[in-house]
């Protein structure tokens, strides 16, 4: 469906001086700014979207609450699909799963391709022992007006498929059980969660996944899972540190991953924003002059730097 930004038709925003700005799609910003190049990815939430003559909506969307407080939003809704087919397709390892992603990516109506690596499935088996024992990777798919006969011909026999709302929701719960278990594990072990939100150009997705796996192995980090939005070359690496040494190694490795993603033309934040803990990554993706252009917009709308201090930019005097 594309980014959230393009589905926003209007906003009411309270600015830091107490004024209220009401804008609709097509209302242009009242200042000129240089264009900041975007990463060559389907998603990017790192920094502000800036380009000459841009809409106010495009500036506020994804700004992490650093420019104003959105109190009302008008959204464009799409018709609910009459029929959605869902499935969990299991593979023996990553390679056939990645081949399937390449083969299926442009299937009409395919709206979701989610990836689980072997370690993700091992963690999920604690709650879902029905996962085939030989499965070393999996894809969760959803297709509008799907053809079950097609999937019967192209998916391994032990895959799961459902067309009912109830079963489809069960598959969604299966997907969301993984980050829940990751968070539970992290809490029990007493370390902060170490995770990525990186995306790379689709053509580099396989390369990036292999890079993750090789570097984790070389650094002797065994407690991790890799899962997420493989259709967008946007996978999450979660390191579940079990010692101080593993935590410190994981921190260094996540920074290395971010640098490599940018080298491949990717982004340091695909969907979740930088917040405070990842604000330091902004300088990996943008030049000092580009970041200064973003800060100039921040100073214009929040001259005292009071909104969401430390989000996106490390704490800075006005």
What are these model-derived regions, one by one?
Residues 279-318:
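Activity-critical C-terminal alpha-helical subdomain
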Residues 238-245, 277, 281-285:
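Conserved PLP-binding active-site segment of the aspartate aminotransferase-like
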Residues 170, 274-279:
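Short, highly charged C-terminal tails/helix-capping segments
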Residues 26, 118, 273-274:
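Short, ordered loop/turn segments at secondary-structure junctions
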Residues 1-107:
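FAD-binding subdomain of flavoenzyme oxidoreductases
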Residues 59-62, 198, 228, 269-270, ...:
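Short conserved micro-motifs on helix faces and helix-strand junctions that flank
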Residues 267-274, 309-312:
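Short acidic/histidine-rich active-site segments
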Residues 61-63, 69-256, 260, 264:
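C-terminal substrate-recognition/cap domain of FAD-linked oxidoreductases
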């Amino acid at each position: 469906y594309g980014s959230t930004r393009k589905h926003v038709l209007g906003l009411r925003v309270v600015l830091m001086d107490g004024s209220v700005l009401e804008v609709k799609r097509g209302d242009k910003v009242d200042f000129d700014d240089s264009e900041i190049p975007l990463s060559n990815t389907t998603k990017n939430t790192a920094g502000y979207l800036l380009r000459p003559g841009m809409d106010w909506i495009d500036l506020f969307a994804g700004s992490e609450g650093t420019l104003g407080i959105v109190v009302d939003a008008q959204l464009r809704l799409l018709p609910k699909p009459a029929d959605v087919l869902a499935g969990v397709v299991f593979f023996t390892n990553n390679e056939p799963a990645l081949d399937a992603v390449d083969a299926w990516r442009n299937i009409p109506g395919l709206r979701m391709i989610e990836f689980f690596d072997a370690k993700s499935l091992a963690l999920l088996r604690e709650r879902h022992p029905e996962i085939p024992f030989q499965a070393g990777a999996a894809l969760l798919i959803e297709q509008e007006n799907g053809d079950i006969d097609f999937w019967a011909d192209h998916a391994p026999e032990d895959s799961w498929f459902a067309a009912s709302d109830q079963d489809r929701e069960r598959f969604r719960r299966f997907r969301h059980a993984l980050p829940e278990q990751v968070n539970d594990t992290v809490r029990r072990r007493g370390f902060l969660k170490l995770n990525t939100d990186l995306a790379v150009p689709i053509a580099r997705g396989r390369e990036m996944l292999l890079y993750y796996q090789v570097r984790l192995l070389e650094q002797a980090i065994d407690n991790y899972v890799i899962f997420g939005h493989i259709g967008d070359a946007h996978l999450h690496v979660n390191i579940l540190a079990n010692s101080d040494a593993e935590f410190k190694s994981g921190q260094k490795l996540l920074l290395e991953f971010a640098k490599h993603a940018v080298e491949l033309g990717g982004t340091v934040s695909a969907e979740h924003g930088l917040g405070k803990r990842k604000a330091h990554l902004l300088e990996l993706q943008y030049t000092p002059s580009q970041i200064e252009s973003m800060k100039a917009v921040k100073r214009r709308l929040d001259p005292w730097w009071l909104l969401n201090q430390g989000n996106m930019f490390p704490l800075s005097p006005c």
